[in-house]
Amino acid sequence: MKYCRIFSIALLSLVTSSTLLHGINKVEWDFFTYIQADNNLAPFGVINVKDMQKVGSTSDVNILVQWDKPSDNMTYRYKILQNNMVINSSIKQEMGFFPEKELADSMTWVKNFFPAKRYALILWDHGNGVLDRSKKQPTNSWLSLPGISKKYLRDRGILYDFTQNTFLDNVGLSSACAKIKTTIGQNIDFLGTDACLMAMIEIAYQVKSSVNYLVASQQTEPGLGWPYADVLSSLVGIPTMSTADFSTATVQAYSNFYETGDNADSSYTLSAIDVSKIQAATTTFNAVLKAIAQSQLVDKTTTNAGVKIARANTLAFFINDYIDLIDLYDNLTITFNKISGSRNAKKKGSLRDRMAVAAVAIVTAVAAAKIAAQETIVSSMAGTDYSGKAHGLSIYYPANCLVDASYKKTAFSKQTNWVKVLNSLR
C-alpha cells in the first residue's frame, strides 16, 4: 500500500545471456525481490528495478527479480546486472492465480539456479498488515491513494493482483515461508516487505519458524518504496556482514533516503525485527493479558477504563487499529501506576486496596513485556511525525474492541488470550 508520487520512468536496458545466469559455487547472498506489480504500483516497479541496476550482481551477491507486470499475461525472472538485466526465464502465465504456491515456487528457481549461503526475500507490493481482505469490499480502490474514502478500509493482506483479484493472506504467507525453508534447507535469513504496515508482532509471529529477520514498516510507505541502490551498495560492499548488520544497514539507508532532500517524508518508518525473539515477546504479552484478566475480577470497570485510556493515548498508524506496542506498554504503565497509587493502607482489603494491588501486578507484567518487545527490535527509525513514538513493532488493537474475523485465523491470536481480552473490554 504505497501512495503515489510524481515520477518519471526511464527505459530499462535488457540483455539476454545464458552465460551470466548462474554459477556453480554458492555466493554469499541472494537478494531476491518478488515484484507483484499487476496493479497501480507498476510504474514504481520499473523505477525500483532501474535502481537495482545501479549496483548490479557481483561475484558475492546475486540480485534477482521475479516480476509480474500488467497486461501481458507473463511472469519474468531476471538476474540484475550493472546497467542491465538478464532474462533467466519467462513463465507463460502471469502471477496471481495461486499466490502462496507461486511465491514458494519462485524460491525453488532461486535455489536451483543461484545457490547461496544466505537468502534475502523482499515482498514488493501493497501491504496492509495482519488483517486479510474482506471480499465484500471493492478491490479496485486502495488505501494508498490520497483522499480515498474510509469505506474502503477493509482491504488487507499483501501481494495484491488487480487482474486476478487475489492476494496473499497471512496463513498463506506463513505456509509459503515454511515451504521455502524446506526448499532452501534453512530459514529465510532476511524477509523484507517493501509494502505498508507490515511491522507487526502478529506478522513476525506468523513466520517465526522460518525467518530470522523481518524488515518492515509500521506506517504506510512512500510510493518509491525502498532505495534499492543504497540498500544493495551496503550489501555488495560488505557481503560477509551479519544478517543483523544488513538489516540495520537497510533501515539506515531507508532513513537517509526519506529524511532530507527531494524525497523527504516526515511520516516514514522502518524497523528490523529479530524474529527469533518474537516468542518471548508474545509470552510476556500474554502475561500482561493474564494480569489484566485478574484485575478485571477485582474491578472490571476500573480495569477496563484504565486499559482504554492507555489505548487512546497510544500512537496509531494509518490503519487506526494498528498501534505501537511499546507505546501501549508505556501508557499502560502510566495509567496503572496512577491506580496503584490510590491504595488506602488504612482500609486493607477494601476494593480500592485490592484494585491497587492488581494494578501493581499489571505494571510489573508490562515492564517485563516491554523489555521483551524492545529486544526484538534490532533497529528502528522514523520521520519527525513519529520520532520517539514509533518504536518498530505494532499490534492490532481496534479501538472499539470489535475483532475482525480474519484476525482470529492468525497464529498470534490462537496462541494468546488477546481476542478474549479484547472482547472483555467492550
Regions inferred by a protein language model and the residue ranges of each:
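Structural recognition of the beta-strand scaffold that forms the well-ordered cores
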Residues: 30-34, 62-66, 119-123, 189-193, ...
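Bacterial Sec-dependent signal peptides at the C-terminal "C-region" and cleavage site
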Residues: 16-26
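Bacterial N-terminal signal peptides that target proteins for export
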Residues: 1-8
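Terminal, contiguous helix-loop blocks that mediate binding/assembly
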Residues: 144-426
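Extracytoplasmic/secreted cell-surface and envelope-processing proteins
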Residues: 40-45, 72-75, 129-133, 198-203, ...
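Surface-exposed loop and adjacent secondary-structure segments within mature catalytic domains
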Residues: 65-91, 118, 122-167, 219
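Bacterial N-terminal signal peptides
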Residues: 8-17
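N-terminal extension/subdomain marker
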Residues: 24-117
